[in-house]
Amino acid sequence: MFIRIVKLTLLEDKVHDFLEHFDTIKDKVRHYPGCQFLEVYRDKDQSNIFFTYSYWEDESNLESYKKSELFGEIWPYTKTLFKEKAEAWSVDKVVTLK
């Protein structure tokens, strides 16, 4: 399992569009084979910056998603809302404390 973090910097006037669109596709993404968890975070100081945080079973699942028809529908539209190019990281969890 690994974690995928994607930073999305949106045009300020497109934040509402992003949130509405995400609401329509979030369940499809979350239930894509291999996706185990999905959250979206919003920066407290810059309200047009979001982070998606997802757990994937393995890298082949994420690659399959990125080549899927679903991603092909989501990503081109989402990119039209960007102020800056998206940044993405695939990371392994090192420590969890509760």
Briefly describe each language-model feature range.
Residues 2-9, 39-66:
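Short, well-ordered beta-strand segments in beta-rich or mixed alpha/beta enzyme
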Residues 4, 34-36, 84:
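A generic structural signal for short beta-strands and their flanking turns/coil linkers
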Residues 8-10, 22, 81:
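Short linear/disordered segments characteristic of secreted peptide precursors
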Residues 10-12, 58, 92-95:
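Non-catalytic surface loops within mature trypsin-like serine protease
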Residues 14-37, 70-75:
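Short amphipathic alpha-helical segments
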Residues 30-33, 57, 83:
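Short conserved AdoMet
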Residues 39-46, 76-98:
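Glycine-rich beta-strand-turn "strand-cap" elements at beta-sheet edges
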